[in-house]
Amino acid sequence: MAKEEFPLKKVCIICAKGTIEDVYATLVMANGAVMEGIETKIFFTFFGLDAITKKQMNSLHTGTVGNPAMRMPGGLPFPTILGMLPGVEAGVSAMMKSTMAKIDIPTVKEFLEMIEAGGGEIYACKLAMDMFKLKKEDLWEGVKDVLTVGDFYEKCGGLQTQIIFT
């Protein structure tokens, strides 16, 4: 009943972390919204910018240190102290990417292209861009604009809008 009275019309997602699991949470939710016909805007800030930076977007890693939810294949526990060992993060990241490829999960770039093709809008944070000394040309070509936080919030205004932080 509530769906008929107040359907979701717009979703604004803020991606502030650059790990595989955080970036993919953003991309999966954004793509799902686009597929449902919901107006979709993504704002990449701080380390989330890695997902839309040409030099970084194919090199995202899994956060192994301090991740109590981390599991090994088959669901076996992964002691967080193992994440500090040299090569573990790279190995876990490679395994995760391999598993994702085997089950046809799109790459970061493919997801961004799908979201953009479906009408989703992708933005970068001006403050984080300045902080990391990035320029618009450093970003994936589908980034619509570099905005301040205030500018992004203006785009997120209106009834039946959700703002999601990942």
Can you say where each PLM-predicted feature lies in the sequence?
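N-terminal glycine-/serine-/threonine-rich phosphate-binding loop
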Residues: 1-22, 28-31
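A glycine-rich helix N-cap at a beta->alpha junction
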Residues: 60-96, 100, 104
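N-terminal beta-loop-helix "entrance" segment that forms/cooperates
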Residues: 48-61
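Mid-chain, well-packed structural core segment of small domains
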Residues: 86-136
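Glycine-rich, aromatic-bearing surface loops/beta-hairpins
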Residues: 124, 137-140, 144-166
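Histidine-anchored nucleotide/phosphate-binding helix
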Residues: 24-37, 42
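Short, glycine-rich nucleotide/cofactor-binding loops
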Residues: 13-23, 52-53, 99-103
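Short internal beta-strands
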Residues: 40-46, 123-126
